[in-house]
């Protein structure tokens, strides 16, 4: 992320990674259970600063999405536009002494997914749904929004019914 966004987050303002019971183990025992134990950072101050870069990248992305929406509004085409944003994985950021997208812990599997557009397509603005959604649901959702048939061979399910509830 550009330096401007990195400077929004200071290491002092960030919480320590959640370790659970791992802090009670000796380092060699923790490392043997840690994903990427050979390549994961071991410097505690560096580990503490990792979230700043991650949060900076998210804030930068959020700003870019805002610019896109502003341009769509300015061009008067937002009323005919659907935006679906999703990430394929999260980041462990040192939680449970893990990094990247190693295991099915919350930091790795809980990712943003939002659908924005005219209410006639996506339902009431500001609706938050906490139901489980999967990446395989994205394609049938976009097909339904486009008015196209969803092939029977598709594993996913459109999220529109979920959002409409």
Where are these regions (language model features)?
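Short, intrinsically disordered, charge-balanced linker/junction segments flanking boundaries
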Residues: 154-165
